[in-house]
Amino acid sequence: MKKIVAFGTLREDVVIEYDFSVPMKEMEVKLNKLDKTVGGSVNNTCYYLALKDSKLQVVLCTLNYTDLVGMLKKRMSCVNYRISTTQEALLQYPVSFIGLRENGEKQMISYDPIIDDSLLIDLLKKDVIDAEVLYTSFYEINERNYSKIATIFNKVIGSGKTIMVDLCPTLNRLSDVSIKEILSSTTVVSGNENEFKIMLKMLGQGGITDVFSEFPTIERIYVKKGERGASLYINDKQEKIDEIHIDAVVSDVIKNTTGCGDVFNAVIIEGMINTKDYQKTLECAVKESGKIAEGGLPWIKE
């Protein structure tokens, strides 16, 4: 059974219908429809991945927010998803407010930072030993932990395993030093166009070619492009960048905007392990991630 280990924080996700054209003044006015779930970007990816392929063992290393862990374990329907927690019980947990646009796309409004993740680093060191893939998001990386995480990444990458990191819209809260250290020990990067623009600006780079040149360990870059689908850029190590592009899927309901990066990344991880067929995997990722715009994702419903 192939093992995927992820490093991520559980959160209470509060999804609300929100008019982004009108600045929020009073939260009460905006709570037309409120949906609370146990979330966190990395957890969502892990949960979907475990549901999609029962032959994979998926492990989430996370802080022991007892209420959220209990809620998540109670509703989990897959035996191949394991929550590995630190020993210390934590009663306070982070909350994310997510705005829901009329077209089904979601956008982060605000989120609480990680409280303390020092014990989580030690947990990750143990669980990652026999993993095929290590996955996390820049949501989980900060100025306190990036050096320790990069050290773990370097050991994993030295054994020929895959390290995938997802970009996030709050990337600019990090220093360019921390971003560079993480990318220097990463093999796969995923994110949307806006997140890549933020990253390129912070690093003073002009495009994908510059990223591959500065970070030779990066083999593949996935870019979600909204209504234009998604692209995969492959570094063939011969001063040539290969590109695979998949257009957005159009249905009678709504145009697929590849709106859910959590699902997109789960499909990419499964493809990396099972098929190695980059084009087929990208096609599936575009299709699956677009389902959130056609009525949501059943696995996050209580």
PLM region spans:
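Glycine-rich phosphate/adenosyl-contacting loop at the front of the ribokinase-like
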Residues: 1-59, 68-71, 254
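Conserved phosphate-binding/catalytic region of the ribokinase-like
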Residues: 3-5, 206-302
